[in-house]
Amino acid sequence: MAFWAGGSPSVVDYFPSEDFYRCGYCKNESGSRSNGMWAHSMTVQDYQDLIDRGWRRSGKYVYKPVMNQTCCPQYTIRCRPLQFQPSKSHKKVLKKMLKFLAKGEVPKGSCEDEPMDSTMDDAVAGDFALINKLDIQCDLKTLSDDVKESLQSEGKNSKKEEPHELLQSQDSVGEKLGSGEPSHSVKVHTVPKPGKGADLSKPPCRKAKEIRKERKRLKLMQQNPAGELEGFQAQGHPPSLFPPKAKSNQPKSLEDLIFESLPENASHKLEVRLVPASFEDPEFKSSFSQSFSLYVKYQVAIHQDLPDECGKTEFTRFLCSSPLEAETPPNGPDCGYGSFHQQYWLDGKIIAVGVIDILPNYVSSVYLYYDPDYSFLSLGVYSALREIAFTRQLHEKTSQLSYYYMGFYIHSCPKMKYKGQYRPSDLLCPETYVWVPIEQCLPSLENSKYCRFNQDPEAVDEDRSTEPDRLQVFHKRAIMPYGVYKKQQKDPSEEAAVLQYASLVGQKCSERMLLFRN
């Protein structure tokens, strides 16, 4: 039996893959394949669990490549920020930014940037054509009202109904369902009051206890760089994120390089603002026009899109509209969980926007667009490093938030392999859904596009669907377990679709999320 103590449940419409379509990576006209679902509403926990099973969102569309069939297998990749050390090339980018801010220096020669992958140029493109045909953005108000009415009715009739026929409800669920248009969003991200929340322009403070742990860690490293340090961490002492100020023989940390003080007469000022992706937020609304213009400029210059292909409808659908319900739990980060735009303001003008999701365990990179006039600053790399540092900063307040999700890694695509340079990082096994260090995966990927990374032949998907009858369905204005729903169905293809959905989302999500069936 499912309970939604946190508020509204996730509500999704599932569409199994039927055809192959054009691949945005290798340009194969009929090589890409994925399954997808339209998320009317989704909790941050459900989306995080879906990420851990190889799913990814683009706007409100959530998709999962058919890994053993698609031409360019897309492996979920995450970086471990707590252990991250910037490489020489990363340091070069950060120093280049500091020189530009301090003295206005512009590097000579061209610079190839490494932006996070475009969720609009990949496998999603083919599936959106299907979604438009199916008119998935149907009468969502009716759906919301139906769910609310079903749950209210269940509350009144709970004594009369059999316990297995309907599930316990929350009266507010209908009010909190995400609508098809972001401007109608009901649930608004809470904006931290002045003086609260993470200050993105400054490194976080350190506690005396953390400083003592750091001293002990350094002492152990000097005595035994491998064994004793591992024992120290195994006792529950994480490695310090912000070590003492670097000495001449100690490399600077990521934070030292990002937040290095600038002279009072610096040539430029860079400010990073975290803005909830909601039209109910005044800062998001006031900066929308400038942000949209930047997006068009980026798409035309970098991806060679036609201006007509970069309308406000497309921009809003992909980068502003999100199914994620904002949450601000007391033990979470001050900014809360949900979808955000991380805006980079240079001298009062937006030059880059990183679209991110903040989840219980992850900061997830969705998309980046920037002003091509500032390509010499390598804003793709710079923003990724800032997001890694931001994850470390959030970890100081919320200890479980300790991973940076970089989307998909495609070994067969040269433009996507750069993600493997943010070490340490892990790839998700497409069969058992366990994380495996990327170093262990690369040899296999050199021999085959599709690989099972888990080397244990006996290992299985621990969250595989074992009790499909417990899957939750919303059908004919009622919420019911699949065991009840299937008794009303005679179409064998419907059973196949529902069981496929259950196998892809896993047992936990299948019991929490509502599968909408018309």
UniProtKB/Swiss-Prot annotation:
Q: Which EC class does it fall in?
A: transferase
Any one Pfam family match given in the protein's UniProt record, by short name? ATE_N
Which residue windows does the record flag with biased composition (Basic and acidic residues)? Answer: 149-165
Q: What is its main location?
A: nucleus
Segments for region (Disordered): 149-207
Give the signal peptide as a residue range, or say none if absent.
none
Q: Which reaction does it catalyse?
A: an N-terminal L-alpha-aminoacyl-[protein] + L-arginyl-tRNA(Arg) = an N-terminal L-arginyl-L-aminoacyl-[protein] + tRNA(Arg) + H(+)
Localization per Swiss-Prot or TrEMBL: Nucleus; Cytoplasm
What are its GO cellular component terms? Answer: cytoplasm; nucleus
- Residues with Phosphoserine modification: 169
Q: Which UniProt keyword terms apply here?
A: Acyltransferase, Cytoplasm, Nucleus, Phosphoprotein, Transferase, Ubl conjugation pathway
Extract the InterPro entries matched here. Acyl_CoA_acyltransferase, Arg-tRNA-P_Trfase_1_euk, N-end_Aminoacyl_Trfase, N-end_Aminoacyl_Trfase_C, N-end_Aminoacyl_Trfase_N
Q: Which GO terms describe its molecular function?
A: arginyl-tRNA--protein transferase activity
Domain of life assignment: Eukaryota
Could you tell me the EC number(s) of this protein?
Answer: 2.3.2.8
Q: Which family does it belong to?
A: Belongs to the R-transferase family.
Q: Which PANTHER family does this one have?
A: ARGININE-TRNA-PROTEIN TRANSFERASE 1, ARGINYL-TRNA--PROTEIN TRANSFERASE 1
What this chain does, per the record? Involved in the post-translational conjugation of arginine to the N-terminal aspartate or glutamate of a protein. This arginylation is required for degradation of the protein via the ubiquitin pathway. Does not arginylate cysteine residues.
Write the protein's name.
Arginyl-tRNA--protein transferase 1
Q: What species is this protein from? A: Macaca fascicularis
Q: What is the lineage of its organism?
A: Eukaryota, Metazoa, Chordata, Craniata, Vertebrata
